[in-house]
Amino acid sequence: MIEETPALPAPVGAGVYNVYTGGPADSALPTAAQLGLEPPRFCAECGRRMIVQVRPDGWWAQCSRHGHVDSTDLDPRR
């Protein structure tokens, strides 16, 4: 049986805004983001700048309206 993968949290899920630039969702991604070296900086739902903390083992980001997301929650191998 195939398990359904859970939806991404609102701050980094598919939304109206690009999580790296704050522009429209269909805008180009910065090179560092394409390589996976950049954490999301803007909420995908509302475009607000998020509070971001980078750690040696990942990052967390928090939108004042849509909550908290941690990179360890997004990695299915952990």
UniProtKB/Swiss-Prot annotation:
Biological process annotations from GO: biotin biosynthetic process
Job description of the protein: Required for the activity of the biotin synthase BioB.
Keyword terms of this UniProt record: Biotin biosynthesis, Iron, Iron-sulfur, Metal-binding
Single GO molecular function: iron-sulfur cluster binding
UniProt feature coiled coil, ranges: none
Transmembrane segments: none
The UniProt record lists the keyword Heme: no
Co-factor binding comment: Probably contains an unusual Fe-S cluster.
Disruption phenotype: The deletion mutant is unable to grow without extrabacterial biotin. The growth defect of the deletion mutant in biotin-free media can be complemented with biotin but not with another intermediate of the biotin synthesis pathway.
Organism listed in the record: Mycolicibacterium smegmatis (strain ATCC 700084 / mc(2)155)
Protein name: Biotin synthase auxiliary protein
Recorded family membership: Belongs to the BsaP family.
Cofactor(s) the record lists: iron-sulfur cluster
Claim: Iron is one of the keywords in the record: yes
